[in-house]
């Protein structure tokens, strides 16, 4: 039995979240009656309202009066008045991942998992399948610039989704094709240990059907080890590793883009082919790897090489993934969502490879618990930045932790040899700090998952204002 077509209204608590908004949008396009509430009147809420979805700003019990079903995200607390009201009314309450899983039953599905790179890889898979005339439905964890949204309703048989591992619910997703980009220590507040995280990814791969396949990056040692523990499922490996089935070679990262070619070697004896002259208009080895994962899926699903090449060259990127926000005095300002040390290191390495100028990193650490658990990694992930400007920690609802803050990170950076790490006292001081350091050909990269994205977009104008 599939989700009844006449079920509704379906009420989303936290409808403005990036994951929730995508599911709500696709369900509305499928003909379901959808409504929802959010604490903030953000861009996602406004977009949904413009598309005819009933939205409420603020959480109140009366918002669920006519609901037949309630969908909640992991960010919603048990004392939320709408959730309390729904349970008093004995309404079915489902998690975001459960509703996503129901949608996935309508299509054949590609699920993209991994600690980093999920959103970009999901966008790339969608782009390549679209180029192959497969017209996929897409539910992503970020805004795909070509669509102007994080969700897209396609007429084809395939769906591409970002599989969020943060609370373990990605194990509920019925994927036919799985991608694992990497596995690093993250979300330890939920999993408790790195071993539990690795076990969850193993089960994620085991869940694919016998007729499906998994695409896994063996450049990452934890993923390569996981490959050795998977039995009875088809695995396609990718990476720069000479043993990869889909191998990234001859990569050139100059000029703010990635040029490379890919060699495909099937386990069938004698099969080998190359796809040459690939250009991705995004810098960074990590993005070339993301593109290789997407290429592996597209090739397996029959997308021609010429279509892959053309689609990669025209890829419009994802919002908040090395997004250019403006220029000042010959320097270019970027906004990036990177908030884990591995992500920060990859972004700054890409910036370093793309310019002959200086790299200035502005970081707003996200969550005290993350800074505490990965403190040593944070102290060493900024080596490719000539200057690091550190803002106060974005708490995301957490209580402060003694000895874990902006100043301790600055001290840690300096203790490990960084030559220029400075404190940002207030957002209003940022333009002055940058103006004293940035010049022609420099890259100014704003990093974090909090309010720093607003600073990144305001910074070009603020710098111009300093010059009068």
From Swiss-Prot:
Principal cellular location given in the protein's record:
cytoplasm
According to the UniProt entry, its GO molecular function terms are: ATP binding; UDP-N-acetylmuramate-L-alanine ligase activity
GO biological process, alphabetically ordered: cell division; cell wall organization; peptidoglycan biosynthetic process; regulation of cell shape
Q: Where is the signal peptide?
A: none
Q: Name one GO cellular component term.
A: cytoplasm
The subcellular localization recorded is:
Cytoplasm
Q: Which reaction does it catalyse?
A: UDP-N-acetyl-alpha-D-muramate + L-alanine + ATP = UDP-N-acetyl-alpha-D-muramoyl-L-alanine + ADP + phosphate + H(+)
The EC number(s) attached to this protein equal: 6.3.2.8
Q: Which of the seven top EC classes does this enzyme belong to?
A: ligase
Where is ATP annotated to bind? 114-120
UniProt keyword annotations, A-Z = ATP-binding, Cell cycle, Cell division, Cell shape, Cell wall biogenesis/degradation, Cytoplasm, Ligase, Nucleotide-binding, Peptidoglycan synthesis
- Is the Transmembrane helix keyword given for this protein? no
- State if Transmembrane helix is listed as a keyword: no
Question: What Pfam families does the record point to?
Answer: Mur_ligase, Mur_ligase_C, Mur_ligase_M
InterPro entries registered for this protein in UniProt: Mur-like_cat_sf, Mur_ligase_C, Mur_ligase_C_dom_sf, Mur_ligase_cen, Mur_ligase_N, MurCDEF_pg_biosynth, UDP-N-AcMur_Ala_ligase_MurC
- Specify the pathway: Cell wall biogenesis; peptidoglycan biosynthesis
- Which family is it part of? Belongs to the MurCDEF family.
Q: What does this protein do?
A: Cell wall formation.
The molecule here is called UDP-N-acetylmuramate--L-alanine ligase
State which gene encodes it: murC
């Amino acid at each position: 039995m599939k989700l009844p077509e006449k079920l509704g209204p379906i009420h989303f608590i936290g409808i403005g979240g990036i994951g929730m908004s995508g599911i709500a949008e696709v369900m509305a396009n499928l003909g379901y009656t959808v409504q929802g509430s959010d604490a903030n009147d953000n861009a996602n809420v406004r977009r949904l309202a413009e598309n005819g979805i009933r939205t409420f700003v603020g959480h109140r019990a009366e918002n669920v009066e006519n609901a037949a079903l309630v969908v909640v995200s992991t960010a919603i607390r048990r004392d939320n008045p709408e959730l309390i009201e729904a349970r008093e009314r004995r309404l079915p309450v489902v998690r975001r991942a459960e509703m996503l899983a129901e949608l996935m039953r309508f299509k054949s599905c590609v699920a993209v998992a991994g600690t980093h790179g999920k959103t970009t890889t999901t966008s790339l898979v969608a782009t390549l399948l679209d180029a192959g005339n497969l017209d996929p439905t897409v539910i992503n964890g970020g805004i795909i610039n070509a669509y102007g949204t994080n969700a897209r309703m396609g007429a084809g048989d395939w769906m591409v989704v970002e599989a969020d591992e943060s609370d373990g619910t990605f194990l509920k997703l019925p994927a036919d094709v799985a991608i694992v980009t990497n596995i690093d220590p993250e979300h330890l507040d939920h999993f408790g240990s790195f071993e539990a995280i690795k076990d969850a990814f193993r089960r994620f791969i085991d869940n694919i059907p016998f007729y499906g396949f998994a695409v896994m990056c063996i450049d990452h040692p934890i993923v390569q080890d996981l490959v050795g523990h998977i039995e009875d499922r088809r695995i396609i490996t990718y990476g720069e590793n000479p043993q990869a089935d889909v191998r990234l070679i001859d990569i050139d990262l100059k000029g703010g883009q990635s040029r490379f070619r890919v060699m495909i070697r099937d386990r069938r004896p004698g099969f080998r082919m190359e796809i040459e002259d690939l250009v991705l208009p995004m810098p960074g080895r990590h993005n070339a790897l993301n593109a290789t994962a997407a290429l592996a899926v597209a090739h397996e699903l029959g997308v021609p090489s010429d279509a892959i090449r053309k689609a990669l060259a025209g890829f419009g990127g994802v919002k908040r993934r090395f997004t250019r926000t403006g220029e000042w005095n010959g320097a270019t300002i970027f906004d990036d969502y990177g908030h884990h040390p591995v992500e920060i290191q990859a972004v700054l390495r890409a910036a370093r490879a793309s310019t002959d100028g200086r790299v200035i990193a502005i970081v707003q650490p996200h969550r005290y618990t993350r800074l505490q658990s990965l403190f040593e990694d944070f102290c060493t992930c900024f080596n490719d930045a000539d200057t690091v400007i550190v803002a106060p920690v974005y708490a995301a609802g957490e209580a402060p932790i003694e000895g874990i803050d902006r100043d301790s990170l600055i001290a840690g950076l300096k203790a490990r040899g960084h030559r220029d790490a400075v404190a940002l006292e207030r957002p209003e001081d940022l333009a002055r700090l940058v103006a004293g350091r940035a010049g022609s050909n420099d890259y100014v990269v704003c990093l974090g998952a909090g309010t720093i994205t607003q600073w990144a977009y305001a910074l070009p104008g603020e710098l111009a204002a300093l010059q009068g």
